[in-house]
From Swiss-Prot:
<dbReference type="InterPro" id="IPR029044">
    <property type="entry name" value="Nucleotide-diphossugar_trans"/>
</dbReference>
<keyword id="KW-0321">Glycogen metabolism</keyword>
<keyword id="KW-0808">Transferase</keyword>
<comment type="subunit">
    <text>Homotetramer.</text>
</comment>
<keyword id="KW-0548">Nucleotidyltransferase</keyword>
<comment type="similarity">
    <text>Belongs to the bacterial/plant glucose-1-phosphate adenylyltransferase family.</text>
</comment>
<feature type="binding site">
    <location>
        <position position="175"/>
    </location>
    <ligand>
        <name>alpha-D-glucose 1-phosphate</name>
    </ligand>
</feature>
<dbReference type="InterPro" id="IPR005836">
    <property type="entry name" value="ADP_Glu_pyroP_CS"/>
</dbReference>
<dbReference type="GO" id="GO:0008878">
    <property type="term" value="F:glucose-1-phosphate adenylyltransferase activity"/>
</dbReference>
<dbReference type="Pfam" id="PF00483">
    <property type="entry name" value="NTP_transferase"/>
</dbReference>
<dbReference type="GO" id="GO:0005978">
    <property type="term" value="P:glycogen biosynthetic process"/>
</dbReference>
<dbReference type="InterPro" id="IPR011831">
    <property type="entry name" value="ADP-Glc_PPase"/>
</dbReference>
<dbReference type="GO" id="GO:0005524">
    <property type="term" value="F:ATP binding"/>
</dbReference>
<feature type="binding site">
    <location>
        <begin position="190"/>
        <end position="191"/>
    </location>
    <ligand>
        <name>alpha-D-glucose 1-phosphate</name>
    </ligand>
</feature>
<dbReference type="InterPro" id="IPR023049">
    <property type="entry name" value="GlgC_bac"/>
</dbReference>
<feature type="binding site">
    <location>
        <position position="110"/>
    </location>
    <ligand>
        <name>alpha-D-glucose 1-phosphate</name>
    </ligand>
</feature>
<protein>
    <recommendedName>
        <fullName>Glucose-1-phosphate adenylyltransferase</fullName>
        <ecNumber>2.7.7.27</ecNumber>
    </recommendedName>
</protein>
Length: 422
């Protein structure tokens, strides 16, 4: 495995690029999963946090000047970044720098995505980048940003926006764009009620990935203009991008493979989308390859022993099928099917866990049945508990997402107070 991947075709560009990761969002659609943590800090894939994917993309793309802007309930996110990303060496121009909301400009906190950057203008200027790469910290994907940087520089664009095809009726939660034959953006609407369809693809819309490459001075100019506009909501998608479409070079960069097909990218903003993206990893050949040694996903994990599967009696056999089981787990006479069991989990005898996601340090006592569920970090599931079979009963105890029927269980719902405030 490489320490990092340095792209050969764009190293000058990547060295002159500052990446800023917007990681301050509340993630309210994830309900109680973000009650005590920011969305980018939510565990994912057995041993990672959501933010690890965008940070790994930066490092693997050769971009090693990175700022992480935090605000909402940021303690676990800050702690994770400090532990996982301290291998960057500032002496040779590498860093992952935490930029919490700290009222640098006035008495207000970050009011929106554009305001978060505006309040850190002095820090951006200090690093003297030629380009600023703005990223969301809450999506799951692998992407070589150097290709997008190269296209931006070659085209002479003022800003380039990463985009991907999505089902048209799912595009209401994204910025939706229209482009000409040269991928110049001709229209941009943030979260439209009736998204525009793509030409010749009536069931698809071209959605923003929340990835922007700005030429630095252009970005500074537009941030200042936006800050001076009393009618602005201080947001890139709602304010800055629509205002520059007509008079400036705003281009789209489709996120696709060598054959022109869309590549794996997931917005895990709801319980169902988080659950689906997690179980995607359990397929035989996942679209997101966690095992690619040329594109490793970096993270922090406490030193843990290997996963252990014990007992081989009929009806009490420790086994996992089509599942991910992370380090430190013990599957003790239990059956796991198409599920993710995260670090330090312990599933006791005579249990069945299927189509579920267990976050780190979950303990499932004997004779439990769990299906179609997300179990939050640190939960202890009492003996004999049944989750996911009777949604009416589950609604009385837990959160059930109405559209999907996925059940979310947290320690607070079980009466287990892990966060004592008084």
């Amino acid at each position: 495995m490489k320490y990092y991947c340095e792209t050969k075709s764009a190293t000058d560009l990547t060295r002159k690029t500052l990446a800023l990761v917007l990681a301050g969002g509340e993630g309210s659609r994830l309900k109680d999963l973000t009650k005590w943590r920011a969305k980018p800090a939510v565990p994912f894939g057995g041993k990672y946090r959501i933010i690890d994917f965008v940070l790994s993309n930066c490092v693997n793309s050769g971009i090693r000047k990175i700022g992480v802007l935090t605000q909402y309930k940021s303690h676990s996110l800050i702690r994770h970044v400090q532990r996982a990303w301290s291998f960057m060496r500032y002496e040779v121009g590498e860093f992952v720098e935490l930029l919490p909301a700290q009222q640098r400009v006035d008495k207000g906190w970050y009011k929106g995505t554009a305001d978060a950057l505006y309040q850190n203008l002095d820090i951006m200027r200090r690093h003297t980048p030629d380009y600023v790469l703005v990223l969301g910290g809450d999506h799951i994907y692998s992407m070589d940003y150097s290709k997008m940087l190269y296209e931006h520089a070659e085209s002479g664009a003022d800003v380039t926006i990463g985009c991907i095809e999505v089902p048209r009726m799912e595009a209401t939660g994204f910025g939706v764009m229209s482009v000409d034959e040269c991928f110049k953006i001709t229209k941009f609407t943030e979260k439209p009620a009736n998204p525009d369809a793509m030409p010749h693809k009536p069931d698809k819309a071209l959605a923003s990935m929340g990835i922007y490459v700005f030429s630095t001075e252009f970005l500074f100019q537009k941030l200042i203009e936006d800050a001076d506009n009393p009618n602005s909501s201080r947001d890139f998608g709602k304010d800055i991008i629509p205002s520059i479409i007509e008079d400036w070079q705003v281009r789209a960069f489709p996120f696709e493979d060598e054959t022109g097909l869309p590549v794996y990218w997931r917005d895990v903003g709801t319980i169902e989308s988080y659950w689906k993206a997690s179980l995607d990893l359990c397929s035989i050949t996942p679209d997101l390859n966690l095992y690619d040694e040329d594109w490793p996903i970096w993270t922090y994990q406490a030193q843990m022993p290997p996963a252990k599967f014990i007992f081989d009696d009929e009806g009490r056999r420790g086994e996992a099928i089509d599942s991910l089981v992370a380090g430190g787990c013990i599957i003790s006479g239990a059956r796991i099917k198409r599920s993710v069991i995260s670090s330090g989990g312990h599933v006791h005898s005579f249990c069945l866990v299927k189509d579920s996601v267990l976050l780190p340090r979950v303990k499932v006592e004997r004779n439990c049945r769990i299906q179609n569920a997300v179990i939050d970090k640190g939960c202890v599931i009492p003996e004999g508990t049944v989750i996911g079979e009777d949604l009416e009963a589950d609604r009385k105890r837990f959160y059930v997402e109405e559209a999907s029927g996925i059940v979310l269980v947290t320690p607070d719902m079980l009466g287990q107070r892990l966060h004592i405030t008084r």
